[in-house]
Swiss-Prot record:
One of its GO terms (biological process) is arginyl-tRNA aminoacylation. Belongs to the class-I aminoacyl-tRNA synthetase family. Keywords: Aminoacyl-tRNA synthetase, ATP-binding, Cytoplasm, Ligase, Nucleotide-binding, Protein biosynthesis. The lineage of its organism: Bacteria, Bacillati, Bacillota, Bacilli, Bacillales. Monomer. It is an enzyme of class 6 (ligase). It is found in: Cytoplasm. This is Arginine--tRNA ligase. Its EC number is 6.1.1.19.
Amino acid sequence: MNVMQENQIKLIEHIKQAVVQAVGLEETEVPEILLEVPKDKKHGDYSTNIAMQLARVAKKAPRQIAESIVPELKKDTKLIKEVEIAGPGFINFYLDNAYLTDLVPVILTEDKKYGESDFGKGEKFQIEFVSANPTGDLHLGHARGAAIGDSLANIMKMAGFDVSREYYINDAGNQINNLVLSAEARYFEALGLESEFPEDGYRGSDIIALGKDLAAKYGDKYVNASEEERRSVFRVDALAFETGKLRADLEEFRVSFDEWFSETSLYEENKVLPALERLRENGYIYEQDGATWLRTTDFEDDKDRVLIKSDGSYTYFLPDIAYHLNKLERGFDVLIDIWGADHHGYIPRMRAAIEALGYSPNQLEVEIIQLVHLFEDGVQVKMSKRTGKSVTMRDLIEEVGLDATRYFFAMRSSDTHMNFDMSLAKSTSNDNPVYYVQYAHARISSILRSGKEQGLEVSKDANMSLLETEAEYDLLKVLGEFADVVAEAAVKRAPHRIVRYLNDLATAFHRFYNSNKVLDMDNLEVTKARLALIKTAQITLRNGLTLLGVSAPEKM
C-alpha cells in the first residue's frame, strides 16, 4: 500500500467517526464513504458526497448534515488543513502538505518498485496476443497489438496480478500447407530448376530467402524425393524459419512471451476430440446435413456454428475451442485475448463456447485492436519507401524509431481507429508526445549530474518541509497518483491511461522547473529538497515508460 492510499484510508476513517459523532449513527450504519479527486484543484484534494448519502436516514437537507459533520472533521489538524462545504452538500478537503512530502523518501526507497501494489493479488490471468500466422512479416495491426498486449501485461503485473503472456502459433491448416509449397517452389528455383509456383503461395522476399536456405542446407537431396518426404522436412524448416523471424522482430520490439503454444500440439496431444466430447456431454452438440454443430444460439450467438464439416474436416472453430479449454485447464482465472479488428464477429461464438464447456463467459475477455493508418506530412502512407509493399512493423520501427512506435501505439484506446502521424513521431519538439516525456526525464538527469558535480547527492533525509511553492505541491500530487493510475489502467485494460499520466507528470515537472531554481548554492537546504523531489519525478517517469516498453534516456 502506498502513502496516498494510506492517507485515503485514514481520511475515510476520520469521516466515518465524524459522521458517528455528528449524526448519531453506529459505525455499521454509516454507508460506504466515497472519495473523489476534484477536476479543479481549487475544490480541494478530495471531495465526498457522504452528506447526500445520509439525507434520507437523517431526514435533513444534505447541506445541513454537512454543516454538522465539518466541525468534527476539523478536529484532525495533522491530516486536514481545511474543510469546506460546496454546492448542495459536497464536503471538500484540503490536506496538510506533510501528506505529500512524506511521499519523497518512500519513492526514493522503493525506486523501481514504486507504483507496485497488491491490488490484483490472487488473480491469475493469461494474455494471448499477436499470434500472427507464421507465414510472413508482422504488419501494423500486429505491431499495435504487440505494444498494447505487452504494456497491459507489464501494467497488470505492477498492479499485483499474476500474468502470463502467450503467443498461439497457427502452425496447422491450409496457410501452412501453402507456406510449405511456396518454400518448395523457391527451393527448386534456388537450384536453377523449374517449378510451378502455387496459386495461393506466399511471394514475399522472406520465402525467396527460405528457398535459398533450403538449397544451401540440403543441396539437391530432396529434388527426386517423394513429395511427402520432401514436404515433411520442408515443413519443419519453414516453420522454424518463420517463427524465428517473428521471435526476432518481437524481441527487437521489446516484446517477450512466457509461452509459445503450437496449434499442432493440440492434435499431437489429443486435445481436440476431448473438447468436442465435453461439449457433447453438456448437451450442446447435434448433427445436421452430415456436419457436426455447436448450439451457440443457447448463449446469445446469432446462429449455431459448424465444428466438423460434412467432408469430415474441422472448421477453425473446433481447435480454437480446444485451445481455450486447454488454457482454462491450466488454471487461469481469466483469459484476455487480443484480436485484430477482423475478428470482432468471432467474440459471441467464442464466449458461447466457453459457457458451453461449463465455464463462465466472464472468464474470457477480448480486446479488439482497431485499424492503423499511417500519415506523413498530412498524406496517407500505404506503401513502404524501402520495399514498395505494405508497411511492416520492421519498416515503421526503422522509419520513426522503436520508442516512438511503442509509445504512439499505446496512446489510444485499442478499440479506436488510429491515425499514426509519422512526421510527429520523428520530430524533436515538445509537440511529439514521447519526446516531451523523455525530455523531462533527460532534463532531470542533467540537473542531477550538475548537482553531483557540485558535490550534491540526493538524500532521503532532505528537509522536505522546505518545499512550499504551488508548483512543487502540484508535482507531488501527480507523483502520488501513480500507483492508483497503474491499478486503474490494469482494471480497465487501458495502457493509454499510463500515457496520459506520463504527459501530466512531464507537464507538472516542466512547470515546476520553469518557476523554481533547483540548484541554488546560496540556499543548500532548499536545493537538497528539490533535488530529492526531481529524483522522485525521474524515478516515476522511468517506471511509467518502462511499463510501455519505452526507454528513459539520460541525455537527448
